[in-house]
């Protein structure tokens, strides 16, 4: 059976054929609003399922941007890999088809997408702690430090994901820093964007970060970890959509999440700033303490007991993460796939002000990331000069 894009009826027939539902009455709907996939919610009695099928192109561009369907298999493999070490934070996978590029997984509709929930004023008191634990566990347990270099290389071969890595390389590390067709620059930001495009130091540092992304295979990454890829409630957190998964630098997922916590402050900056900074604080401290505990208990690194080594590893992760966060702040402000955190600010004057802030904060994090050896340095990180220029 070859690939074809599913209709709602196709989705129902697949889950029924697989024995995941019986012959009882079924309701189903297409709910996907992403750029790369079809997503169907299927309910039969008390059983609720999600069927996600990859498309062979990016919907935002069309068939002129073809994509390999292999990413669907990579995504389900990553979900299963992450579930081995962080099961409370990963949806259960019931079935996957490589040929038809679909995965059937648990329905999470009892939770809300974090980005939308935050915009509606929802509170997620455990989110930062949960994601800190999730990333510490998924990154540590898929790294050389936990499984050794031979086993890691064998695992990494399963996550060769060139199409989606190419998207990241272009949309995060290249296009926002040049006059690219994919950019979406709001009128009134031209002077700020010119400042970025003409900043030689900034471009040099972005090039270094891109080189890290391309060449440094520390651990299995989610690859696209933002608040739109997380379902949560006050008590529960689930991370979805790891179709960008590949072996890359520890700091990338960490930086992506930090960037989107910054974005989550912008809809009501004066009120939310301190709350989001506290979230970043909780996230990093949970990540660092969990990673360090796993290292001390389970690392197979020959020099694992060398004085200060794990602290040096965490310092490097933090610095890289801040640089990657800066790139994401700039990309999501003027590049492809803008964030609702900024776009839904109705007052155009305020919206432009917040976008300028995001661009300057991003540039400052990129250029000055090496000032932060520890999280105490980040707490004291002063970008007043950049933000006031």
From Swiss-Prot:
UniProt record, GO biological process: L-methionine salvage from methylthioadenosine
General function of this protein: Catalyzes the phosphorylation of methylthioribose into methylthioribose-1-phosphate.
Protein's name in the database: Methylthioribose kinase
Record-listed E.C. numbers: 2.7.1.100
Pathway note: Amino-acid biosynthesis; L-methionine biosynthesis via salvage pathway; S-methyl-5-thio-alpha-D-ribose 1-phosphate from S-methyl-5'-thioadenosine (hydrolase route): step 2/2
Pfam families in the record: APH
Membership in a protein family: Belongs to the methylthioribose kinase family.
Entry keyword annotation includes rRNA-binding: no
Keyword Nucleus among record annotations: no
Enzyme class: transferase
Reaction catalyzed: 5-(methylsulfanyl)-D-ribose + ATP = 5-(methylsulfanyl)-alpha-D-ribose 1-phosphate + ADP + H(+)
GO molecular function, one term: S-methyl-5-thioribose kinase activity
Binding residue positions for substrate: 224, 331
């Amino acid at each position: 059976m070859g690939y074809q894009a599913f209709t709602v009826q196709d989705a129902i027939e697949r889950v029924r054929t697989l024995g995941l539902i019986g012959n009882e009455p079924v309701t189903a709907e297409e709910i996907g609003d992403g750029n790369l996939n079809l997503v169907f919610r299927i309910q039969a009695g008390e059983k609720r399922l999600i069927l996600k099928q990859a498309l062979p192109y990016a919907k935002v561009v069309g068939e002129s941007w073809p994509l390999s369907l292999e990413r669907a298999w990579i995504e389900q493999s990553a979900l299963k890999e992450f579930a081995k070490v962080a099961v409370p934070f990963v949806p259960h996978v019931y079935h996957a088809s490589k040929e038809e590029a679909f995965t059937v997984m648990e329905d999470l509709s009892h939770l809300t997408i974090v980005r939308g929930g935050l915009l509606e004023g929802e509170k997620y008191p455990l989110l930062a702690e949960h994601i800190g634990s999730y990333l510490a566990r998924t990154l540590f347990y898929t790294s050389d430090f936990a499984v050794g270099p031979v086993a890691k290389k064998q695992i990494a071969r399963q996550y060769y994901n060139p199409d989606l890595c190419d998207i990241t390389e272009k949309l995060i590390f290249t296009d926002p820093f040049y006059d690219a067709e994919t950019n979406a620059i709001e009128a009134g930001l031209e002077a700020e964007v010119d400042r970025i495009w003409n900043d030689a130091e900034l471009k040099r540092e972005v090039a270094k970060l891109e080189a890290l992304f391309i060449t440094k295979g520390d651990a299995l990454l989610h690859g696209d970890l933002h608040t739109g890829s997380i379902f949560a409630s006050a008590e529960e957190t689930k991370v979805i959509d790891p179709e960008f998964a590949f072996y890359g630098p520890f700091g990338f997922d960490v930086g992506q999440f930090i960037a989107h916590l910054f974005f989550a402050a912008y809809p009501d900056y004066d009120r939310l700033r301190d709350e989001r900074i506290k979230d970043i604080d909780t996230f990093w401290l949970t990540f660092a303490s969990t990673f360090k505990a796993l290292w001390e208990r389970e690392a197979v690194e020959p020099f694992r007991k060398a004085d200060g080594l794990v602290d040096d590893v965490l310092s490097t992760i933090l610095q890289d993460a801040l640089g990657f966060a800066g790139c994401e702040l700039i990309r999501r402000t003027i590049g492809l796939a803008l964030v609702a955190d900024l776009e839904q600010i109705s007052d155009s004057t305020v919206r432009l002000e917040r976008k300028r802030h995001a661009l300057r904060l991003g540039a400052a994090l990129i250029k000055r990331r090496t000032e932060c050896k520890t999280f105490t340095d980040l707490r004291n990180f002063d970008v007043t000069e950049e933000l006031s220029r």
